[in-house]
Amino acid sequence: AVGDDTPQLY
């Protein structure tokens, strides 16, 4: 999710 420390799609 947005703001998480791991790279991921919005």
Curated annotation (Swiss-Prot):
Subcellular location: Secreted
Temperature dependence: Optimum temperature is 40 degrees Celsius. Retains 65% activity at 20 degrees Celsius and 24% activity at 100 degrees Celsius.
Keywords: Copper, Lignin degradation, Metal-binding, Oxidoreductase, Secreted
Catalytic activity: 4 hydroquinone + O2 = 4 benzosemiquinone + 2 H2O
Cofactors named for this entry: Cu cation
Entry's pH dependence statement: Optimum pH is 2.2. Activity declines sharply with decreases or increases in pH and is absent above pH 6.6.
One GO location term (cellular component): extracellular region
Example GO molecular function: hydroquinone:oxygen oxidoreductase activity
Regulation: Strongly activated by Mg(2+) and Al(3+). At concentrations <50 mM, activated by Ca(2+), Mn(2+), Co(2+) and K(+). Strongly inhibited by Hg(2+) and, in a concentration-dependent manner, by Fe(2+).
GO biological process: lignin catabolic process
Superkingdom classification of source: Eukaryota
Family of this protein: Belongs to the multicopper oxidase family.
Function per UniProt: Lignin degradation and detoxification of lignin-derived products. Has activity towards ABTS and, to a much lesser extent, towards N,N-dimethyl-1,4-phenylenediamine, catechol and 2-methylcatechol.
Name of the protein in its database record: Laccase
